[in-house]
UniProtKB/Swiss-Prot annotation:
Subcellular location: Cytoplasm
Gene: IPT4
Residues involved in ATP binding: 12-19
Role summary: Involved in cytokinin biosynthesis. Catalyzes the transfer of an isopentenyl group from dimethylallyl diphosphate (DMAPP) to ATP and ADP, but not to AMP. Has no DMAPP:tRNA isopentenyltransferase activity.
PANTHER family reported in the protein's UniProt record: ADENYLATE ISOPENTENYLTRANSFERASE 4-RELATED, TRNA DIMETHYLALLYLTRANSFERASE
Cellular component GO terms, alphabetical: cytosol
GO molecular function term, any single one: ATP/ADP dimethylallyltransferase activity
Major enzyme class: transferase
Protein name as it appears in the record: Adenylate isopentenyltransferase 4
Length: 318
């Protein structure tokens, strides 16, 4: 990689494997990862926001992941543009490859767009709201999963998250944090608002066997709402990625459906993380992505990005 001017951007719907792929690629290419999921910036709600565990990170440095105080307000896209740019600069100074991974596409646009107006929402219906000129020489990868397969997987994943303590985590968050007048930052995370009415109505008690039918229905209603809102989020994310593509962003799509079908089968049969699912992932997803990234890194320097990089370095030293 020459001149430290290139980076990889992993995109896709929630639950599509962006975090896993980013770590896989980081281990191949001596990279560090910058989180671009706006709900994962904050400390707390690690299960609810599905933050990568230390084990999942496999020794790869991560930036802007679970670092910020959730009571300090909301990180805006404009603030992320500055914070992530600083992380990119630090990573490239270490001669490492920056990998951006996450599903908050408006924040991704804010960071990468050469021209950015905080007052202009990029995904509005107004023509030309998305900036097609980029600050960095990006290799974009979109992990795509068939919608029906992804929805089934997300439903199973949420059931597992609930069994792993998501409800208890949300209840403790509500008890220990002062809620803002309007949802801000992590308070907007799917799960927090859906359980808000329930937690105002019932005192904390996780012994579900003692719950009356009305309480059980209130709980199940919240879980259904979480699933429905998660499904809608994935649709919105895909719509935004397609808008970026239509605006000229060269986003390469890699189909991960076969891997997710195997993950669903394994989950239903109680196998946990199946060896076969990993083999399919490596063949159908990781190997093509390694080729895409290697091809991008081997390309001649795009001197527009090189001179932009030098200008940034010059200004930072003066």
């Amino acid at each position: 990689m020459k001149c430290n001017d290139k980076m990889v951007v992993i995109m896709g719907a929630t639950g599509s494997g962006k975090s896993s792929l980013s770590v896989d690629l980081a281990l191949h290419f001596k990279a560090e990862i910058i989180n671009s999921d706006k709900m994962q910036f904050y400390d707390g709600l690690k299960i609810t926001t599905n933050q990568s565990t230390i084990e999942d990170r496999r020794g790869v440095p991560h930036h802007l992941l679970g670092e910020l105080n959730p009571e300090a307000g909301e990180v805006t896209a404009a603030e992320f543009r500055v914070m992530a740019a600083e992380a990119i600069s630090e990573i490239t100074q270490r001669k490492k490859l920056p990998i951006l991974a996450g599903g908050s596409n408006s924040y991704i646009h804010a960071l990468l767009a050469k021209s950015y107006d905080p007052e202009n929402y990029p995904f509005s219906d107004h023509k030309g709201s998305i900036c097609s000129e980029l600050k960095y020489d990006c290799c974009f990868i979109w992990i795509d999963v068939d919608q029906s397969v992804l929805f089934e997987y997300l439903s199973l994943r949420l059931d597992l998250m609930m069994k792993s303590g998501m409800f208890e985590e949300i209840a403790e968050f509500h008890r220990s944090k002062k809620a803002p007048k309007e949802p801000l930052g992590i308070w907007k995370a799917i799960g927090v608002q859906e359980f808000d009415d329930y937690l105002k109505m019932y005192k904390w008690d996780n012994d579900m066997d003692k719950w009356d039918p009305m309480r059980k229905e209130a709980y199940e209603k919240a879980v259904r709402a979480i699933k429905e809102n998660t499904f809608q989020l994935t649709k919105d994310q895909i719509t935004k990625i397609n808008k970026l593509r239509n605006a000229g962003w060269d986003i390469k799509k890699v189909d991960a459906t076969a891997s997710f079908r195997e993950a669903i089968r394994a989950a239903k049969e109680g196998e946990g993380v199946a060896e076969m699912q990993r083999k399919i992932w490596n063949k159908e997803v990781l190997e093509p992505c390694v080729k895409i990234v290697r091809s991008h890194l081997d390309q001649p320097i795009n001197y527009y990005y090189y001179y932009f990089y030098l200008l940034k370095r010059f200004l930072s030293l003066n």
